Amino acid sequence: MAPLAEVGGFLGGLEGLGQQVGSHFLLPPAGERPPLLGERRSAAERSARGGPGAAQLAHLHGILRRRQLYCRTGFHLQILPDGSVQGTRQDHSLFGILEFISVAVGLVSIRGVDSGLYLGMNDKGELYGSEKLTSECIFREQFEENWYNTYSSNIYKHGDTGRRYFVALNKDGTPRDGARSKRHQKFTHFLPRPVDPERVPELYKDLLMYT
């Protein structure tokens, strides 16, 4: 399969995540990691805050859009370091802590905090973890009437019907073929669940500046 252009080219004139547009933050140039909101504080400010007390950990709930993505089939989606994607029943699995980055209105990228890989979907509807943020890693986030969300590829859809490829997990936690998945199926319904920093403090060390 021919390589796809990185999102820097895909999004054209979008400048940087540091530039706010409404409630969304735009992506930086291709190859650069989007800065976290916590990184906007100066080093002096971070140092003055001292060690990670309970109040600081609680404050992080609102700093990052870090979530667990719970599927109606009973699994949390996780992105493993080897690039594979699968479901786990474990609450607060390190590989199941995901960072949601708003690209534009209704468009998001999803990054595994521990693995550092972006969720991607190829033209066959297969899920994988990508080291680079490409156009295959941009998804349409749709809020459904049953209070769940669906995530569909922004570039891949069926030519005859226009139906998009959906992120989905089977009943055994394995990734489901996105080309065969439909919006009304429970395989495609996900609920973003909050992350408790006290359950996974190692994923917040870079923000709290402690070891």
From Swiss-Prot:
<dbReference type="GO" id="GO:0070374">
    <property type="term" value="P:positive regulation of ERK1 and ERK2 cascade"/>
</dbReference>
<feature type="compositionally biased region" description="Basic and acidic residues">
    <location>
        <begin position="38"/>
        <end position="48"/>
    </location>
</feature>
<dbReference type="GO" id="GO:0008083">
    <property type="term" value="F:growth factor activity"/>
</dbReference>
<dbReference type="GO" id="GO:0014059">
    <property type="term" value="P:regulation of dopamine secretion"/>
</dbReference>
<keyword id="KW-0964">Secreted</keyword>
<dbReference type="GO" id="GO:0043410">
    <property type="term" value="P:positive regulation of MAPK cascade"/>
</dbReference>
<dbReference type="GO" id="GO:1904340">
    <property type="term" value="P:positive regulation of dopaminergic neuron differentiation"/>
</dbReference>
<comment type="subunit">
    <text>Homodimer. Interacts with FGFR2 and FGFR4. Affinity between fibroblast growth factors (FGFs) and their receptors is increased by heparan sulfate glycosaminoglycans that function as coreceptors.</text>
</comment>
<dbReference type="GO" id="GO:0090722">
    <property type="term" value="F:receptor-receptor interaction"/>
</dbReference>
<dbReference type="GO" id="GO:0030334">
    <property type="term" value="P:regulation of cell migration"/>
</dbReference>
<dbReference type="GO" id="GO:0007165">
    <property type="term" value="P:signal transduction"/>
</dbReference>
<dbReference type="InterPro" id="IPR008996">
    <property type="entry name" value="IL1/FGF"/>
</dbReference>
<dbReference type="GO" id="GO:0042491">
    <property type="term" value="P:inner ear auditory receptor cell differentiation"/>
</dbReference>
<dbReference type="GO" id="GO:0007267">
    <property type="term" value="P:cell-cell signaling"/>
</dbReference>
<dbReference type="GO" id="GO:0043524">
    <property type="term" value="P:negative regulation of neuron apoptotic process"/>
</dbReference>
<dbReference type="GO" id="GO:0005737">
    <property type="term" value="C:cytoplasm"/>
</dbReference>
<dbReference type="InterPro" id="IPR002209">
    <property type="entry name" value="Fibroblast_GF_fam"/>
</dbReference>
<comment type="similarity">
    <text>Belongs to the heparin-binding growth factors family.</text>
</comment>
<comment type="function">
    <text>Neurotrophic factor that regulates central nervous development and function.</text>
</comment>
<dbReference type="GO" id="GO:0005576">
    <property type="term" value="C:extracellular region"/>
</dbReference>
<keyword id="KW-0339">Growth factor</keyword>
<dbReference type="GO" id="GO:0008543">
    <property type="term" value="P:fibroblast growth factor receptor signaling pathway"/>
</dbReference>
<dbReference type="GO" id="GO:0043395">
    <property type="term" value="F:heparan sulfate proteoglycan binding"/>
</dbReference>
<dbReference type="GO" id="GO:0008284">
    <property type="term" value="P:positive regulation of cell population proliferation"/>
</dbReference>
<dbReference type="GO" id="GO:0060043">
    <property type="term" value="P:regulation of cardiac muscle cell proliferation"/>
</dbReference>
<protein>
    <recommendedName>
        <fullName>Fibroblast growth factor 20</fullName>
    </recommendedName>
</protein>
<dbReference type="GO" id="GO:0005615">
    <property type="term" value="C:extracellular space"/>
</dbReference>
<dbReference type="GO" id="GO:0022008">
    <property type="term" value="P:neurogenesis"/>
</dbReference>
<dbReference type="Pfam" id="PF00167">
    <property type="entry name" value="FGF"/>
</dbReference>
<dbReference type="GO" id="GO:0005104">
    <property type="term" value="F:fibroblast growth factor receptor binding"/>
</dbReference>
<feature type="region of interest" description="Disordered">
    <location>
        <begin position="31"/>
        <end position="53"/>
    </location>
</feature>
<dbReference type="GO" id="GO:0005102">
    <property type="term" value="F:signaling receptor binding"/>
</dbReference>
